[in-house]
Design a protein with these regions (language model features):
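Gly/Ser-rich "nucleophile elbow"/oxyanion-hole loop immediately N-terminal to the catalytic nucleophile
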Residues: 267-302
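Short beta-strand element of the alpha/beta-hydrolase
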Residues: 213-222
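N-terminal secretory signal peptides and thylakoid transit peptides that target proteins
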Residues: 1-15
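C-terminal catalytic histidine-bearing segment of alpha/beta-hydrolase fold enzymes
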Residues: 352-355, 372-445
C-alpha cells in the first residue's frame, strides 16, 4: 500500500528527448513534449487533457479529434493554445490541446485503500462513524500519477502552411498541469500555543493588493480525505478549488484556506480535536499577515468538515459572517448559538445521518426564535434550474436556509445506493451551485 507521503507525486520525469534533425521534425508531427492536464470535479481530480508542444505555431483550423489518439481514452476535441492550459485557446499556438472525455473509465485518479475490516462513511472504521476526534485513520485515498501516451495520427498544419504528417510514434507525458490546484501554496503552521503542526493550502488572489481588503473562505474536508499529504483536500472535490477558480475569482476575489488534517477532526459524539483551536489560530495569523476583511470570514465544510464548522460556530459565534454547511450534523442540544447566525445548509434525503441530524438542528433553531427557510431541490438540475429555484427560495430573505436534495436525486445513474453514496454525493453537487456561493459572499458580520 502506498503511504500518504508516497502518493500524489504527479507527473515526475524528464522531458522526452527527440533525436531527429529540425527539418525532419517539421515534416513529421513530432512534438517536443507532452503535459498531462488535470481538473478537479465534484467527485475528485481527473485527467482531462494532454497538451502537446511543437517547435512552431500550429494552425487551429486544420485540427480535428481524428488527428490524435490517447491510449485508453476518448478524444473529444483538439485545438491550439499558447500554453499547456486549455484556457489559453487561440487560432494558432505552439501547444495542441487534446481534450479527453472526463467520464472515461480511466479519467478519475483517486483510488481508495481501506484497511481490512474497515467500513462506514467515506472510509472510516467499521461501525459507520469517522472514528474518534484526534485519531489517525487507517485508510488512504491514493492518487495515481497523471500520465498518458499521445500520438499524432493525422496530418496537421503550421501557421506558415507547412504540413506535419502523422509521426507514427506515441509520446509519453513528462509534466503535469493541475488546473486551479497549482495556484495554491502548500504551507505549514506551527501553533506554539497548542503545540500542533497544521499543513495547509492557501490561495492568494491574483494581483493581490495590500491596500485592499479581501474576504477569506475556510474549507474543511471530510474524514475520507484525512492525510498528511497537503494537496489531498484540493484533489478530493470542489470544496476548496471552486472558490479559487478563474470564474469565481473574477466575480468574487478572495483568499481560500484549505487545511490538510492528518487526524480525525470531529466525531459522532460531537467532539473535536485540538485542530479546531489551531485552525482558528491560523486564521488569526493570516489576518495579521494579509489584508483580510475580518467582517467577511466564511466557513464551509463537508461531512466531518461540516461538523467542525458547526463546532466553530458554537465556540466562536461572532467570527464568521456566514457558514455553508454540507452533509453534516451535530448534537442538537448544543446548537442554540447558531440561531443568531447566517447559515446555508445542504443535505441529501438519502443521507442517513445528516438528513435527520439537520432536521433536529433546524427544529432547535426555530425553538430559539430563528426563521428557517426550507426547500427540497433536485440534485440533477442544471445550472439554470438551480438558479431559478434559488431565486424563488431566496425571496424569503431568511438568514438560515435549509435545502435537502430529494430522495434518489443525488446518486448518479448506475451507481449503487448502498453505504454512504447518498452522503458523499451531496458535496459532489452542493459546491457547484453558484447562487449559493454568491449568497455566502453577500453576507457580512
Amino acid at each position: 500500500m502506498h503511504s500518504r507521503r508516497e502518493f500524489l507525486i504527479v507527473g515526475a520525469g524528464a522531458l522526452l528527448s527527440i533525436n531527429l534533425p529540425a527539418s525532419a521534425q517539421e515534416r513529421t508531427g513530432h512534438g517536443l513534449g507532452a503535459t498531462a492536464v488535470t481538473q478537479v470535479f465534484g467527485d475528485g481530480v481527473r485527467l482531462t487533457a494532454v497538451a502537446v508542444e511543437y517547435h512552431e505555431p500550429i494552425a487551429a483550423g486544420g485540427l480535428s479529434p481524428s488527428a490524435f489518439t490517447v491510449e485508453g481514452r476518448t478524444v473529444t476535441d483538439v485545438f491550439a493554445s499558447t500554453s499547456a492550459d486549455p484556457a489559453d485557446r487561440v487560432d494558432a499556438g505552439r501547444f495542441v490541446i487534446v481534450a479527453l472525455a472526463p467520464e472515461d473509465e480511466g479519467a478519475l485518479l483517486a483510488e481508495r485503500v481501506q484497511a481490512q475490516g474497515g467500513g462506514g462513511e467515506g472510509g472510516p472504521p467499521a461501525g459507520g462513524g469517522p472514528g474518534q476526534a484526534g485519531d489517525i485513520p487507517t485508510y488512504d485515498t491514493v492518487y495515481r500519477d497523471a500520465e498518458a501516451r499521445v500520438g499524432q495520427t493525422g496530418t496537421i498544419a503550421t501557421l506558415d502552411g507547412d504540413a506535419l504528417a502523422a509521426s507514427g510514434e506515441m509520446l509519453a507525458t513528462s509534466d503535469t498541469l493541475n488546473l486551479v490546484v497549482d495556484d495554491f501554496r502548500q504551507l505549514q503552521f506551527n501553533d506554539r500555543e497548542i503545540g500542533d503542526l497544521l499543513r495547509y493550502n492557501l490561495f492568494v488572489p491574483k494581483d493581490y493588493d495590500a491596500s485592499r481588503s479581501y474576504p477569506l473562505v475556510l474549507f474543511m474536508h471530510d474524514a475520507g480525505a484525512t492525510s498528511d499529504v497537503t494537496r489531498t483536500t484540493l484533489y478530493q472535490g470542489l470544496g476548496a478549488v471552486i472558490w479559487a477558480s478563474p470564474q469565481d475569482q473574477a466575480e468574487r476575489p478572495c483568499f481560500v484556506l484549505a487545511p490538510q488534517y492528518a487526524e480525525i477532526i470531529a466525531d459522532d459524539d460531537s467532539r473535536t480535536s485540538s485542530m479546531m483551536e489551531t485552525t482558528i489560530h491560523l486564521i488569526e495569523a493570516l489576518a495579521q499577515e494579509y489584508a483580510i476583511d475580518r467582517d467577511r470570514l466564511y466557513v464551509t465544510g463537508q461531512s466531518g468538515g461540516c461538523m467542525m464548522s458547526i463546532a466553530m460556530d458554537i465556540a466562536y459565534p461572532g467570527l464568521f459572517a456566514a457558514s455553508f454547511l454540507v452533509a453534516g450534523q451535530w448534537n442538537p442540544a448544543l446548537v442554540a448559538p447558531l440561531a443568531r447566525q447566517k447559515l446555508f445548509i445542504v443535505v441529501s434525503q438519502d443521507d442517513s445521518k445528516a438528513w435527520p441530524g439537520q432536521n433536529s438542528i433546524t427544529a432547535v433553531l426555530e425553538q430559539e426564535g430563528a426563521r428557517v427557510n426550507r426547500a427540497v431541490w433536485d440534485a440533477r438540475w442544471n445550472a439554470e434550474e438551480f438558479r431559478t429555484a434559488f431565486d424563488e427560495f431566496n425571496a424569503e430573505g431568511s438568514p438560515i436556509n435549509y435545502v435537502a436534495f430529494g430522495e434518489g436525486t443525488v446518486i448518479p445513474e448506475g451507481e449503487s445506493t448502498a453505504g454512504a453514496s447518498g452522503h458523499r454525493n451531496t458535496w459532489r453537487v452542493a459546491y457547484t451551485i453558484e447562487p449559493v456561493r454568491e449568497w455566502i459572499f453577500r453576507q457580512q458580520r
